[in-house]
Amino acid sequence: MIFVDTNVLYSVLVKTKFSKSAQNIILMSSDLATSATVLSELVFVSLRKLCKERYGTNNYSEFRRAIALKGYSPFKEDLDLIFGLVGDRDILMLPINDNLDDWNNAMARYNLMPNDAMIASTCLKHEISKIATFDSDFLRVDWLSVIDQSK
């Protein structure tokens, strides 16, 4: 089982310098998993970018205002693509690790941002030792190995 991080899914949906590697990861024959933390990040980052492109929002407050006024209906097709990617590839949705000690320890021990610590602790809870990511911060986590994205 390989845990898939936000930046891999994002790079499948949006052209980035990692898109070819991300496609290779998604097409691997391995079982893939992710979590609500990753999907929340993916939806947020994707909609924030789309809102800027479509409505000229330049900051978080403007983004929130646009969503409050327009709702999610202007993004229905985009959201269908995001959620469809997970469903179509049969990426397993894992429950997050709600053990606060695990989360706090991952933050403190590896100097991870809160969401990255949540992802690492979720991998720990589910005994997942491989992560597909373009985030070098996960290289510091001793129970995770970052898979070689060039394969």
PLM ranges: what are they?
Residues 8-9, 38, 118-119, 137-138:
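Alpha-helix capping/helix-boundary segments
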Residues 28-29, 89, 141:
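Structured helix-beta-strand junction loops
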Residues 80-129:
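Active-site neighborhoods of divalent-metal-dependent phosphate/nucleic-acid chemistry enzymes
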Residues 1-38, 44-61:
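Short, well-structured N-terminal submotif of metal-dependent ribonuclease cores
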Residues 17, 21, 34-37, 95-98, ...:
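Alpha-helix N-cap and coil->helix boundary residues
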